[in-house]
Amino acid sequence: MLVKPSDGYGSQNVSVVFSESDLGNLMESLGVHASNRFSVEKYIRGHMIGCDVFSSEHERILIGINDKLMFPPPSFAMRGSCFPSDRYDIPAIRDYAFEILDAVNFDFGASHIEMIVAEDGPYLVEVNPRLVSAQIPHQMGYALERSVYADLINLHLGLPITKLRDLKPRWFSAIRWVVASQPGILESIQLPEHVDESIRRVVLFKETGDAVRPPIHNGDRIGYVIAVGDTQTAAEEIADRYVQETLVILK
C-alpha cells in the first residue's frame, strides 16, 4: 500500500509498504513529523498520467494527456513529463476522466485528474478542481502554441469552449529536472553552451550555497528544462540530453 501524511505536499514523506516490518519502520520514522493523519491507498504498478479537462454547461473537452516520469525508488519526485502523449488509449482515458467528473458532479471549470495506467486499465489517483499547476501550463503552452491560462479565463467569461475540441498540439513538449547526484552544498551550475530552438525554457530554483541532495521529493530538484520535438520520443531525448550536459558542481 501507499502511505502519505495528509499534511504533506510535493511528494514529501510518501512511502510504499510491502510488509508489516515496512509499516513498523514507517510509523517510527514519521511519528515525530506527521499530524497522525495519513492517506492510505492501494499501490498500483503502472504509469502515472495527468489529464486536464475543461467543462462547461454544454460539454467537456480533454485538453490532453501528460505522461509523467518519476525518479527510481525510493524517490517519489517527478523526473519530468511530456505533453501531449500518444502512448495511451486516448478515447478510453477520456471516457474514464469524464465518468469521474460526472461521479463527483463537477460541471464547470478546469480540472486536473491524475491516474495510474496499469495493465488492466486506468485507476484514479486524485481529482483537482483546478488547472494543473507548477510548470505544466508552460509546458502545455509550448506544445499548443497558445495560453491555457487565456483559455481558462475565456471559459470563466462565458465564452464557448467548442473551438478547443479540435485543438491539435503543434509539438510534443517534454520537461526534465536537474538534480544533484549526491548530497552537498551547491557551488555552481554549468548549463550547455550550444542549444537550438528546441530548448524553450530553462529555470533554476537553487542558488549557490544551497544544500542539495539526490531527489527524495519534488523540493529537492534544482531546476528544469522544457524542450519540444516532432514526436514524444524526440522531445524527451532533447530534454534528457540537455540535463545530461548540465554540470552540477558541489563544494
Give the location of each predicted region.
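A short, flexible beta-alpha/helix-coil linker loop
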Residues: 7-10, 133
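Short, well-ordered beta-strand elements within core beta-sheets of diverse protein domains
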Residues: 15, 42, 85, 141, ...
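Peripheral (often C-terminal) accessory segments that flank ATP-dependent C-N-forming ligase machineries
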Residues: 153-251
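A short linear hydrophobic-aromatic micro-motif
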Residues: 1-3, 36-40, 162-164, 201-203
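Protein kinase-like catalytic core scaffold
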Residues: 1, 61, 123-126
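Active-site "cap" helix and flanking loop/linker of ATP-utilizing ligase/carboxylase catalytic domains
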Residues: 92-113, 119, 128-184
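Internal nucleotide-binding/catalytic subdomain
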Residues: 7, 14-120
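Short, flexible turn/loop "capping" segments at secondary-structure junctions
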Residues: 5-7, 74-75, 215-220
